[in-house]
Amino acid sequence: MKVYKSFLIATASLFLFACSSFQNDDYAMNYKGQIGEPIMAIAMLSEQQHEWAGTPYVLGGVSRRGVDCSGFVQKTFFDRFNLRLPRSTVEQANYGKHVRKEDIQTGDLIFFKTGRGPNGYHVGIYVKEDKFLHASTRGGVVYSSMNNPYWSKAFWQVRRI
């Protein structure tokens, strides 16, 4: 009987350890969203805004100590969608495909002629319902409305990556 109990315990232990899970970092998944999936893209952009909220605007910056508009767009597209974009607003304004304002979709780049900065351009990422995410000179990383008179007047173009 003692041998039988030992056999049962050994067999049960084998099953328990054989079925237990382990985490191997080699197989860990780091999901990056797809810019073409609107719901996922909105969630990814929301996460990025949450992480970068409070980051001040700093011309030429690309870190949480300070970031400018094109740096934030470049960082967001790489961090969230694994896409590499050019660094400057001028280069980003020539990247991808031109899209009519009426056809704007989540993840499109929206450009403005503000007359500020080294080239007078500003860029953000369209989210939904006329809202876009950007690094603002006044509020840092924020959502703004395209319907705001300032942004509406300064609107220039939309590009799809």
From Swiss-Prot:
Pfam families: NLPC_P60 (PF00877). Its main location: membrane. Residues 39-161 form the NlpC/P60 domain. It is found in: Cell membrane. Belongs to the peptidase C40 family. Transmembrane segments: none annotated. It is a lipid-anchor. The keyword Lipoprotein applies. A lipid is attached at residue 19 (S-diacylglycerol cysteine). GO terms for molecular function: cysteine-type peptidase activity; endopeptidase activity. Keywords: Cell membrane, Hydrolase, Lipoprotein, Membrane, Palmitate, Protease, Signal, Thiol protease. This is Probable endopeptidase HI_1314. It is an enzyme of class 3 (hydrolase).
